[in-house]
Swiss-Prot record:
Compartments, as annotated in UniProt: Plastid, Chloroplast inner membrane
Signal peptide: none
Residue spans crossing the bilayer: 7-27, 111-131, 186-206
Species, as recorded: Buxus microphylla
Function: Contributes to K(+)/H(+) antiport activity by supporting proton efflux to control proton extrusion and homeostasis in chloroplasts in a light-dependent manner to modulate photosynthesis. Prevents excessive induction of non-photochemical quenching (NPQ) under continuous-light conditions. Indirectly promotes efficient inorganic carbon uptake into chloroplasts.
GO MF assignments: antiporter activity; proton transmembrane transporter activity
Membrane protein topology class: Multi-pass membrane protein
Protein name as it appears in the record: Potassium/proton antiporter CemA
Any single GO BP term: potassium ion transport
Gene Ontology terms: cellular component: chloroplast inner membrane
Chief site of localization: plastid
Amino acid sequence: MAKKKAFTSLPYLASIVFLPWWISLSFNKWLESWVTNWWNTRQSETFLNDIQEKNILEKFIELEELFLLDEMIKEYPETHIQRRIHKETIQLVKMHNESHIHTILHLSTNIICFAILSGYSILGNEGLFILNSWVQEFLYNLSDTIKAFSILLLTDLCIGFHSPHGWELMIGSVYKDFGFAHNDQIISGLVSTFPVILDTILKYWIFRYLNRVSPSLVVIYHSMND
């Protein structure tokens, strides 16, 4: 019976893992030309936030200062410097334009992907139920020592001493995937907040659920943790 459930739930599990990647790849290619054409036609400034505007101004000022310094050292004529500034400004505008296109593209793709996955989960309720029952049966058959070791390993990975670097990479990757500009302050705030929230949830879960369901597991977990 357990093997039958495992084989039945494997296609559903594989579809959950690979479907988001396939949807993202397909819709990225399909939407790219449409979003590029829409953005270049509308020239909308809706998605220009204060952080992006500040970054562009800083880059432009830095660029101008570098060219002026180069002029003082090499004694270039003023017209030559102006041409270089004009050329680099156009390049900066192109980069800014492409950044906005990628932001809209990634955001649109993620929204579509989330909607399709939500519909798939609702329609595939039977497969989700079989997968859930198989996972519960698999976990139930494990010994308390293995369960305690697994919980300890996961907690050390997620909220341990070395976890902030992993959280920083993961949050930065998600932030980039949604097309937003990199912001150290926001990422640092999330990195310092998420592990604390997870630690609180874990302690509450151990206190409310594990103490009632498997007291021996809690004893083994605390012994390993100490």
